[in-house]
A protein has these predicted regions:
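Bacterial N-terminal signal peptides
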Residues: 8-18
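N-terminal prosegments of processed precursors
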Residues: 23-118
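Extended acidic/polar, glycine-enriched regions
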Residues: 109-177
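Catalytic zinc-binding patch centered on the HExxH motif and its immediate surroundings
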Residues: 235-237, 267-301
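Catalytic Zn2+-binding segment of zinc metalloproteases
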Residues: 318-322
Length: 322
């Protein structure tokens, strides 16, 4: 299945009324809120491990309230939320990770271990649940990497407010988050004096995206918002040029040694900023004119907003990430 067809499928599924799942409906098992699961993933090409960092209760659940079991759970990894003691599976999604990319690099193949921070967004449970994160082999076999129970009343679940000082603008709002695909354009490398540029970029790329298929025919089921925390410096790091910038997300060219690969390892900062608006997926819009970007499935994508191929980069990298 192509990425475009996958987008169409997810948008269509989100419009179908809630149907029975397991032993009940969405409201029987989940609140209309988000459980943010932060974890660390570490190892090398031959070994990998996961460890829980923290749990956070955030705002409204942006995902669908029906079809919580992904019919096509692509990706190197999978997360499952189940009733305790081997009960029904209540939620399931496939995903990729930054560490999954690292495992294919030269340093990882020579045994150099690295640790990276990751996040999953889940519907917030009404009762105690079991959460399992597993690696998936090409043939479909799974290896459990970490599993734990979550008590929604537990004091270990943080409930602080999202990062302050963040600007949120509407690019295109079609409806309720449960019934729409919610895309957040998170700005990177925009200073306080460049917020108007960020707002113009959000509107420009919203218009472009919704003019192309499959998004054009599904625009009544897509919400797009812009989210930005001003950066001290404009632009992003370019290590091979000796250019270093203090920015909100710490994004950098030359990720994993590839000149055009543009990613961020500051996942917690990214998620703290993005939490100011409901989202299913993140597009990091970088204030730069150099050709570059990247995309991780069900994580995020990046693209540079001011080069001659910016529109192509957005559509291409979004296809990798969602």
């Amino acid at each position: 299945m192509t990425n475009h067809r996958l987008v169409q499928l997810i948008v269509c599924l989100s419009l179908i009324p809630a149907a029975p799942m397991g032993a009940g409906t969405f409201g029987d098992h989940f609140e209309d809120a988000t459980l943010r699961l932060d974890f660390y993933q570490y190892g090398d090409a031959e070994t990998e491990h996961m460890a829980l960092d923290r749990l956070v209760k955030q705002g409204r659940w942006a995902g669908p309230i029906a079809h919580l079991i992904d019919p096509h759970p692509y990706g190197r990894y999978i997360v499952r939320v189940s009733e305790v003691d081997g009960g029904d599976v209540l939620f399931e999604r496939g995903f990729d990770s930054y560490f999954g990319e690292y495992r294919m690099t030269g340093p990882a193949e020579t045994g150099v271990s690295r640790v990276y921070h990751e996040t999953l967004l889940l519907p917030f449970p009404r009762h105690e649940v079991q959460i399992d994160l597993s690696a998936r082999a090409v043939e479909g076999a799974e290896t459990l990497l970490v599993g734990f129970t979550v008590d929604p009343t537990g004091i270990e679940i943080a409930r602080e407010q999202p990062t302050p000082g963040v600007t949120v603008i509407d690019g295109h709002i079609a409806g309720d988050p449960h019934e729409c695909l919610d895309i957040s354009f998170v700005g990177e490398g925009y200073t306080e004096d460049e917020i108007e540029t960020f707002e113009a970029d959000v509107k420009r790329f919203t218009k472009l995206m919704l003019s192309r298929e499959p998004y054009a025919s599904s625009k009544d089921s897509i919400n797009i918002r812009g989210v930005v925390l001003p950066s001290p410096d404009s632009g992003v790091d370019e290590p091979t040029k000796g250019t270093w910038r203090a920015t909100a997300l710490g994004a950098s060219f030359n990720s994993f040694g590839s000149p055009r690969y543009l990613l961020t390892e500051a996942n917690r900062l990214l998620r703290d900023i993005a939490a100011n608006a409901p989202y299913d997926t993140i597009v990091i819009m970088v204030n730069h004119d150099r050709y570059g970007g990247g995309g991780l499935y069900n994580r995020y994508c990046t693209f540079t907003a001011h080069g001659p191929f910016a529109g192509y980069l957005l559509l291409h990298e979004f296809g990798h990430s969602f």
